[in-house]
Amino acid sequence: VSWGRRAALFAVGILVAAGAAVASIAFSGGGSSSKPVHVEPEVNFALPPASDGCNDVTTVAGGAQQVPLTVSAVAGQVAESVNVCIGGQGPYPFVLDTGAGQSTIDAHLARRLHLAAAGPSSIFAGVGCTGRAQPVSVGSWSLEGIELAPQQLTAASLPQIGGKGEPVGLLGSDVLGRFGAVRIDFAAGTLVVAGAEDPPLSGGTPYTGPVGQLGPPVSLTHGQGTTVPLTVTPSPGAVSLGVAVRFHGGAERNFVVDTGSSQSVAATGVSRDENLHGTNLAQRQATVCSVITVPLVHSGPWSVPRVVLHPQLIGETDFGVISAGGIEGLLGSDQLRRFGWVVLDYPSGVMVLG
């Protein structure tokens, strides 16, 4: 299950809930519909230990701050989570989700913490279901001891969020972007931020990096890695990251850089146009308010600017109305983990792959 694919209507213009308009399995690309379909079982990811408490931050070279990151790899899928404390209570496990433009909290936990409503609730729709989202205000909260600025969160009841042994929220790019640049170190199991929070990214005009001359701080890259341009789209209370992906050297496809997606996904139209070879495998994946089944296809040769990606199985699904915003896929943690670490620099509009 991809924890980060379930808040599509909360994250402005970002799909983090695969299959928001999928009503059935559509096996295309390789004619695999004639074969018996094997549906992979849902997986459970490890969560950060509660024993880490609310203050496990350390200062490292260059003044950067480092916190533990739980990286869990199960059956080819990869997820990362961190401990968040709210109002001195917790810790609570949150998915580290760059694909979530707006951070989200389980509705039951929000009520238990008495988080005040920050506006009217709204209705969202998924596959054969509807739900209600409520903006709430959070004042004092922290990431493993790193103080976070007060802001609004989206409270909602989502599949595989808030139950026993499940995370209780998504820590999104609205928070991560305020640190300027972050290093997600899959190999070391750490999240490193460049320093204290800055104000949110201003303006609502998308920009493509690299912007400026400085780039990511050496305290995060250690002078290594390959720089890849990103398209950053800031909006009030939300941020999205996009990267150009090519299959077989073909046309550029706009993918969201989505650590909350435990498996990478391509839109059905992309899979068809690029003739991605189908399989007889499928996975159960969560949308904003339901769990659906999507086919798996072979990526074949694929790449981002300056970097060849590792061939693998990826999900294929119809993104529905979200595709109207230009989203054609999700570059998930299953692929990003193969590079050992990744640095995301929001102001500069670049990603550095280890």
Name these PLM-found stretches.
Residues S2-G354:
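Pepsin/retropepsin-fold aspartyl endopeptidases
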